[in-house]
A protein has these predicted regions:
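Flexible interhelical turns and helix-capping residues at alpha-helix boundaries
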Residues: 32-35, 54, 105
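Short acidic-aromatic low-complexity motifs
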Residues: 16-48
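A generic structural signal for ordered secondary structure
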Residues: 20-30, 69, 81, 112-114
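Short linear motifs centered on Gly/Pro in flexible linkers and helix caps
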Residues: 7-8, 19, 125
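A solvent-exposed, acidic/Ser-Thr-rich amphipathic alpha-helical stretch
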Residues: 39-91
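Short histidine/acidic/glycine/proline-rich micro-motifs that form metal-
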Residues: 30, 56-58, 101-102
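A beta-strand edge to alpha-helix "cap/lid" segment located at domain peripheries
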Residues: 74-80, 87-157
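Short, Lys/Arg-enriched N-terminal segments with co-localized hydrophobic residues
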Residues: 1-14
């Protein structure tokens, strides 16, 4: 899976392994009805001390990251993740994606982007997700939805 070689980057930063675009596509793709990555799969790509941040939480450590992913899957009837674009430059990667969550018969769609920073060992040491949590979550809810759309209109228009 990993090709062992050294890549020399600016400022004398050296990565001994490189995660490929295909590796990231595999991690960031999950059709409805398929299993989420296993703990072993996460451990292949994530540093033991990974820092994960998204609009709803911040975790530190691989076990906490895995628990956060497991909690998301357990809260939902099903989850999908579709990758649109991936870019890797030196020790930084970006993944553009769409996540779908089916909860109690309703589907919530979240377009987003992930920024990944790779450590010297080539594993992901920081994972930060950027997406709008409130609009897709509360937009479809009666009473809250119109209020959220009104509030957004005050900031965006």
């Amino acid at each position: 899976m990993f090709v062992s070689f050294r890549i020399f980057l600016k400022d004398n930063f050296v990565m001994t392994r490189v995660i490929s675009i295909e590796d990231l596509k595999g991690l960031f793709t999950k059709p409805y009805g398929t299993d989420a990555p296993t703990k072993q799969k996460w451990a292949e790509f994530y540093n033991e001390n990974v820092i994960f941040v998204d609009p709803t939480q911040k975790t530190e450590g691989l076990n906490c990251y895995i628990k956060a992913q497991e909690k998301l899957v357990k809260r939902c009837d099903d989850v999908f993740l579709k990758t649109h674009a991936i870019s890797i430059s030196e020790n930084c990667g970006f993944v553009e994606w769409t996540m779908g969550l089916k909860i109690m018969g309703k589907e919530f769609i979240y377009p987003g982007t992930t920024r990944l920073l790779f450590g010297e060992n080539g594993l992901i040491k920081e994972h930060r997700d950027y997406f709008d949590f409130c609009g897709p979550t509360f937009g479809p809810v009666p009473i809250l939805g119109p209020f959220i759309r009104w509030l957004y209109s005050k900031f965006v228009s």
